[in-house]
Amino acid sequence: MKFVTYTRVEGTEPRFGYLRNDFIIDILYAAIYINENHGNSEYLSIPTSLTRALENWDGSFEKLKNLDRSLPNTLIHTYSVHGKPIAVSSDSVQFFPPVPEPKTFRDFYAFEQHVKIARKNRGLKMNPVWYDLPVFYFSNPTALFGHNDNVPYPEPTQALD
């Protein structure tokens, strides 16, 4: 499952969902739908943000997988609860970072080809220790952007990594 934080209308509160094909399933609306149409309230306790779901991930993830199994497999975008669709096209939303305000952000130096090229550009050979020791640095947790967001950068910038 690929989890997302999104909004359908700019300026509204972020919502917690996940991708299924080309649609985003809204977890809260889906839980209400299952409760009202199938009498199953267990999914109403799923947290309404990925940040909160991560606090008890084992329990949350099991419920999220079961929620998905409980939903119709076809025409998911035609189902609604209280006039709100339980699924919307992924093209019709604004994405936030999946965890909108992480407490910390570690950027791992983990892609071999990237590391090799960066070292070669500095006249260095690949260090064999890199294969045994994960290397990371702390980065700015407020500098995260959602899918398709415009990332601000200084005017003379010609390329982004």
Q: What spans do the regions from the language model cover?
A:
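Non-heme Fe(II) oxygenase catalytic core, chiefly the N-lobe of the double-stranded beta-helix
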Residues: 131, 139-161
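N-terminal non-catalytic cap/leader segment that marks the start of a structured domain
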Residues: 1-135
